[in-house]
Each structure stands twice: as C-alpha cells, then as structure tokens.
Design a protein with these regions (language model features):
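Pocket-flanking alpha-helical
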Residues: 86-130, 143-166, 176, 256-260, ...
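Conserved N-terminal structural module of periplasmic/extracytoplasmic solute-binding proteins
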Residues: 14-121, 198
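Glycine-centered hinge/linker elements that transmit conformational signals in sensory
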Residues: 249-252, 282-370, 375-377, 384-390, ...
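Helix-loop-helix "hinge/cap" segment bordering the ligand-binding cleft or interdomain interface
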Residues: 156-284, 296-347
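Loop/turn elements at helix/coil->beta-strand transitions in domains of secreted/extracellular proteins
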Residues: 39-41, 73-75, 105-110, 162-163, ...
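Hinge/lid segment of periplasmic solute-binding proteins
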Residues: 116-214, 412-431
Length: 436
C-alpha cells in the first residue's frame, strides 16, 4: 500500500515549546519509487535517547503499535532518533530532509520534529499539509498567542488560516537549578573572602544545609580557597543575585576570580572540569538576552514578517540599524567578558560559565547530579537525571545486565540525592536593570 508522506516539526527556539508542522511530500508529477519508508509512518528527530521527550515518545509509539496493530488500515509507527538520523540539531535535520525532497528520494520521513525554518523551507516545495478544514487542528484549538506564532511564515498570505506548526509540548528549557552542597561551599568561601551572604534571603534559606562538605564527593571543589580575606569585600549574595541572567554571570566571574588552589591539594587526578554556572541551549539563552536588550518586543527584533502584496516576507530593516548592530556587539562582549577560568591541575579547570553542548554527555542536569557545577539553567523535564533515581542508577553505571545492589550503592555514593538538588522555575529576567 503506497501512503502519502506527511511532515510534523517542532519549535523550541522561539517559544521553548514543541510544535508540529505538517507537509505533504509527494507530487503527482514527480513519482518516487517504492522504498523502505513505505507502509509505515516514520518519525525523525534530532534528539537522542537521553532526551526526556524521546524516552516518553518511544514508549508512546510502542504502545500505539501494540494497541492498534489489528485495526483496519493500520500503519506501524517507527521513531528514528538522532542515533538513526545522524542529525544533532533541528537545522541539520531540516537540511537532510530538504535534500531528500530535492533529490526525489524515497527516504523522506512522514513526521519530523524541527522548527519554523523547516516549515518555511518545506513550504517552498508546496509540501505543507493543509489543515484548513480540519475539525480539531484549527485556530479555536490553540491559545491565541501560540496560534499567532505558528500560522504565519515567509511566503504565506495574510488571509491564510493554515496552521504551519502544531504545539506538541510546553516545557521550560531554562529552569534554574542548584546543587545545594556545592552552593553552601560557595557561600562559605564568599564569607571567608569578606563578602556578605544574606541569610534572610529566600534563596539562602532554601539552599542552606549544615553538613554540606560531607555530601560533596571527592571533587576538586575541596582544593579551593580564597585569595585573601578581603577579596570579596563589597560583594553581597542575596535573592537579587539569582533573579536575572546578568547578575548570575557577574557573580560567577567575580567568585571564580577570587579563588586559588590550596598549596597542598587533597584531591588529585584528572576529572571533569568544574563550573560555577552551566547553561543548556546557549544559543537560545543568548537570543533571549539579545531580545531583552533590543526592546523586548516583536517589533524591535532584528527581523520581522512584513506584508507586501498580500504575502508575508522577512524584513531585516532593524538588523541594518547601527544602534542594533552595536547592541549585538555589546551583548556578545558581555557573554565573553564574564568568562574566566582557574587552573585546577591535571588538565582540569574551573570555569565561571559554561555552555553545555548537549548530545550524549554534556548537560547541566548531569553536572548538577555529579557535583560538577554549582548552579545551572536546565530543562525541568530532566529532573530525574539530576538526582539518584531509577533512571540514573540504570543508565550511568559501568556494568551491563540487571541492576545490582552495588550499582545502587555506587549511585548513592557519587550522585546527588533529591534533597541535595533544588529546582526553581524558569529564569525569565535577563537584564538586571530592567526586570519587567
């Protein structure tokens, strides 16, 4: 049975949420030969098996295939994660699929999780699925703010009521998360260096613990000391410190600059680099920061949709303004200038800020779990990866086969417990001088 090929994609860069774009991928004038993607529904993504969404999605696909296997007209669903697609970003996945369309390949998936750029590119091939008359997926089904973000792309018309993206999942990717034992060490060092820690602040009260040094495993945090008892004079750590991105950056740098190694370090050997502040999805964080500096509105952003001859196109007038170009340079310099390091020996450093690369090994939640970062910005859906949990016990072990009591003991000895980690809500304030 030859099926029509469709597309679904998601948006994470604009709304930090998942959405789906739909596309028809066959043309009567350009028939494609029967291939291995026929007679099934293929979903492709740039996310690997460690993404929380993929763990849930894969189980949902398995459940669907089992429950509907005997339904007339049933097509099995195959989820292809980045291990199969070899795409590690939405852009790369989009380029792969667009290349397959251009070459008239039979290996064009039915569903892909990507972004608005993908919808724009596929729309250029006239492949977006028209849902105008769909009784469920229409304007009334969505919140107006979400709908208005997904129903207009370059090349669409003013009168179009198509939904180019379907919101799939609303989850914050930038929650503030703390490793409580390491944070208490930071507080102690700030006070040793003449700084002030507001112990009446809500943040301190949530993070405070007495036996924090006993909870930190054999990490080089224990090799650190302040350069002098006045190095942090004038520094106050309070709720404002953790209320916005700029203050977090500045604190991370100042704290790192005030440290040195003890003359006789007690922890030796090569380990993973330590970080004061680690962030996931760095490009998205920078984009939001730049957005705030450019005016915090759609009209002041570097590019916008403009209507010309009843059709939307991209307008780059704001990008050409000298003031905005200067703002780009200033925001870049702010990120760059707040980065500093301290040599920890053994080819290891302490970094004031660090942008995780994701993939299979570089996530803020994982560093929080391993006591390798003090605080970070991470995806809240990754909570169970930031603490001792059935997932972390099963996944992060050296043995194979069934989980043993030794695996459980190793996790408890090396990973942060749920009581050692504090997750907060999304960090929405970026500019310390404009907290609106």
């Amino acid at each position: 049975m030859r099926k029509r090929t469709k597309f679904y994609m998601y948006s994470i860069a604009v709304l930090s949420s998942l959405g789906i774009f739909l596309s028809s991928c066959t043309r009567a004038s350009q028939p494609v030969q029967k291939g291995e993607f026929d007679d099934k529904v293929v979903i492709q993504t740039a996310q690997n098996q460690f993404y929380p969404l993929m763990r849930a999605f894969s189980q949902l696909v398995d459940l669907y295939n089992k429950q509907f296997a005997n339904t007339p007209g049933f097509l099995p669903v195959e989820l292809q994660q980045s291990e199969k697609t070899n795409a590690t970003s939405e852009l790369q996945l989009t380029n792969n699929v667009v290349g397959s369309i251009r070459s008239n390949s039979p290996l064009v998936p039915n569903i892909i999780l990507a972004d608005l750029n993908a919808a724009y590119q596929i729309n250029g091939f006239n492949r977006l699925l028209d849902l105008s008359n769909n009784p469920i997926i229409n304007e009334s089904y969505f919140d107006s703010d979400i709908y208005n973000n997904f129903n207009k792309i370059s090349g669409s018309t003013q009168s179009s009521d198509k939904v180019y993206a379907i919101p799939f999942n609303l989850t914050t990717t930038d929650s503030l998360v703390f490793n409580k034992p390491v944070m208490n060490l930071l507080f102690s060092l700030v006070e040793q260096g003449g700084g002030t820690v507001d112990k009446n602040s809500a943040t301190y009260k949530e993070l405070h613990m007495e036996d924090f040094m006993e909870k930190i495993p054999n990490k080089k945090w224990k090799n650190l000391q302040v350069k002098s008892n006045e190095i942090y004079k004038g520094l106050t750590v309070d709720d404002k410190t953790f209320s916005n991105l700029e203050s977090l950056f500045e604190f991370s740098k100042k704290f790192t600059e005030g440290l040195e190694l003890k003359q006789t370090p007690t922890v030796t050997g090569q380990q993973r680099d330590l970080k004061v502040f680690m962030l996931n999805y760095g490009p998205n964080i920078y984009q939001k920061y730049l957005w705030s500096k450019l005016g915090n509105s759609r009209d002041s952003w570097l590019w916008n949709l403009k209507l010309q001859d009843n059709q939307f196109d991209l307008d780059f007038s704001n990008l050409k303004k000298t003031a905005n170009q200067n703002t780009i340079g200033e925001t870049y310099d702010f990120f760059k200038n707040n980065y500093t390091t301290l040599n920890l020996n053994d080819k290891q450093v302490l970094k004031s800020i660090y942008f995780g690369t994701g993939g299979k090994s570089d996530w803020a939640a994982w560093d929080i779990r391993n006591f390798d970062t003090a605080f970070g910005i991470a995806s809240h859906v990754g909570w169970n990866q930031s603490v001792v949990s059935p997932f972390t016990i099963r996944t992060f072990r050296s043995t194979q086969g069934d989980v043993t009591q030794q695996d459980i003991n190793n996790a408890k000895n090396n990973f942060a417990s749920a009581d050692d980690v504090l997750w907060k809500t999304q960090l929405t304030k970026l500019d310390k001088n404009n907290l609106n």
